[in-house]
From Swiss-Prot:
GO terms for molecular function: ATP binding; metal ion binding; nucleoside diphosphate kinase activity. It holds the Pfam family NDK. Homotetramer. Its EC number is 2.7.4.6. The active site is at residue 115. It comes from the Bacteria. This is Nucleoside diphosphate kinase.
Amino acid sequence: MERTFIMIKPDGVQRQLIGEIVGRFEKKGFKLVAMKVMTVSQELAEKHYEALNDKPFFSGLVNFICSSPVVAMVWEGNSIVSTSRQMIGATDPHAAAPGTIRGDYGVSVGRNIIHGSDAIETAKREISLWFKDEEVNEWDATLNPWLYE
C-alpha cells in the first residue's frame, strides 16, 4: 500500500482547518497511520525544503513553516500520492480548482494551507525526515474490503 506525507501548514492550523482537511482524506477512504502537532525547527524546515534552497523565497518559507505549529501526517492508500495531489490542488490557490483544498481555503501562494509529497520517492524521504519508524502505525482498517478489490 502506498504512503504519502501531508502537512497542514501554520495558516491551516491557525484557521482551524485541521478537522476539515483530515475529514477529506478519511472520506476518500485513506488511512491515517501517523499524526503529530509540532512546532518545526529551522533545521527540519531547511532539510524538508532543501530542493528550494536556491530560490529567493526560501528563507521566507522556512520562517513561515517555523512560525506556528503544523500538523504532520502519514496517510496510506492506493495511488495516494497522485490522488492526494489532486485533492490538494495547484500550488497557487488562485489557479486551484474549486473543490480542492487550496481552491477552497488557500489565500496566496505563500499561504496555501497544505503540503503533500509530489512523488513516491519524495514521500518516502519526507516520511523518514518527519517520523521515526515506530511512530508510523500498521493497522487493518475494517473498511478495506469495501474499498479495495
